[in-house]
Design a protein with these regions (language model features):
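Non-catalytic, alpha-helical, charged scaffold/linker segments
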Residues: 110-227
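Acidic, glycine-rich loop-and-strand cores that form catalytic or ligand-binding grooves
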Residues: 172-306
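N-terminal single-pass transmembrane signal-anchor helix
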Residues: 14-48
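C-terminal accessory segments of extracellular proteins
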Residues: 279-374
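N-terminal leader/signal peptides at the extreme start of proteins
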Residues: 1-17
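Conserved hydrophobic/amphipathic alpha-helical signal-anchor segments
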Residues: 34, 39-89, 101
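Short catalytic/ligand-binding loop motif for oxyanion handling, primarily in non-cytosolic enzymes
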Residues: 67-68, 74-76, 82, 113-118, ...
Length: 374
């Protein structure tokens, strides 16, 4: 500061910030951001995992209400091909009809945002098939004003014969599925367990899987070869505690969506409807056919050595997967080796398993072929 007679005191101009100082500040900010961002991401994922667990708990409350009213935990899988009309049959329809908007309650961490059954709804040709429940669902209803109400699946299958309206095709079909099914909350990115929607196998005296209806093919995925949705009596008499029997979990992608639907682009991942049931540990397939007259001791030992194929569940929460159990509890199961799968006892290098690390031990997650006591 200096004094000038005619102008008084004046300030000397301050030195500006040098380039080096500016770079130091930028480096400090960058380091701080690098330190904070992982913590922010962890906090964000913790929130997503909590939201997912809350979804599953609410679904569990719905299952408990359903079993109290109707004896079964649900009416089946969210699967038009195997279980019938998705707006009337299946655990998603059960919950939506009771006021739970399942399609709005998606696992927020799962990159798959839609169920694989939408590919069938978009393109599968309907035909009479007595081996599965009627995919058309309930018959049309005449309303008090004389109008007809036709459920979406029936309209997809046959249109409205009373007005000579054909079923929608192409873009009209896509828009119809989007408006009448997807946007009305009939959707999920959770996968049901085989126990929830099939619960047990139907075997003949030689230990072979059979179809209860003549002329139909036997399959672990078919309702006709299984005991159907889990009921209270079957669970109560089980050899496993309800806290170990999984019902629902974060879903793994089982394919890609065929067309744009809502916020989901074509070729987006889509989750499978339910896990595949009991398979042999050496092949990941159901036991092969037994010869007629095979002793029970022989075929029972083969079935008893199988394990549930839980590859339909995915560890989408930073290597953990949320599972809902039959007692209403929700637990996070960790993918310990980072292979993207949850191993419940399968050997390494089979079906995508990186090694034989058991991430779902039998004391935590039940995996037997039958809920019945041995």
């Amino acid at each position: 500061m200096v004094f000038q007679p005619n102008s008084g005191f004046v300030h000397v101009a301050r030195r500006g910030v040098t380039l080096v100082e500016l770079l130091v500040v930028i480096v400090i900010i960058t380091v701080l951001m690098a330190m904070l961002l992982p913590a922010v991401n962890v906090a964000r994922e913790s929130g997503r995992q909590a939201a997912c667990q809350n979804n599953l708990r609410q679904f569990g409350v719905g299952f408990s209400s359903h079993v109290a009213r109707r004896g079964t935990y649900c009416t089946g899988a969210f699967d038009w091909r195997r279980d019938g009309c998705v707006t009337e049959v299946g655990w998603v329809a059960d919950l939506v009809q009771s006021g739970t908007p399942v399609g709005k309650m998606l696992c927020p961490s799962n990159p798959a945002r839609i169920a694989l059954t939408f590919n069938d709804l978009l393109s599968m040709a309907w035909d009479v098939d007595t081996c599965v429940p009627d995919r058309r669902g309930s018959p049309p209803q005449t309303m008090p004003d004389g109008s007809r109400r036709i459920n979406p699946c029936r309209f997809l299958a046959e249109g409205d014969p009373s007005s000579s309206t054909p079923p929608p095709t192409g873009e009209d079909r896509r828009l119809f599925v989007e408006k009448e099914i997807l946007l009305k909350h009939f959707n999920t990115n959770y996968t049901a367990s085989w126990y929830l929607v099939r619960s047990g196998v139907v075997l003949d005296g030689s230990g072979n899987l059979v179809a209860r209806q003549p002329g139909c093919s036997a399959s672990l995925l078919a309702r006709g070869s299984t005991l159907g949705p889990l009921n209270a009596a079957r669970l109560d008499s089980s050899s496993a505690p309800a806290s170990n029997v999984p019902l629902l979990g974060c879903g793994a992608a089982g394919g890609m969506l065929e067309a744009n639907l809502g916020d989901n682009d074509s070729n987006s991942p889509a989750v499978m409807p339910f896990t595949r049931g009991p398979v042999q540990t050496a092949t990941l397939e159901a036991p092969p056919p037994f010869s007629a007259g095979t002793p029970m001791a022989t075929w029972w030992a083969v079935w008893n050595a199988t394990l549930q194929d839980y590859r339909g569940f995915a560890p989408v929460h930073r290597n953990t997967c949320n599972l809902l159990f039959a007692d209403g509890s929700v637990r996070a199961i960790a993918d310990q080796n980072g292979d993207g799968l949850l191993n419940n006892g399968f050997p390494s290098n089979l079906g995508g398993f990186r090694d034989a690390t058991v991430e779902m031990p039998p004391d935590d997650v039940f995996s037997k072929w039958s809920l019945r006591p041995n």
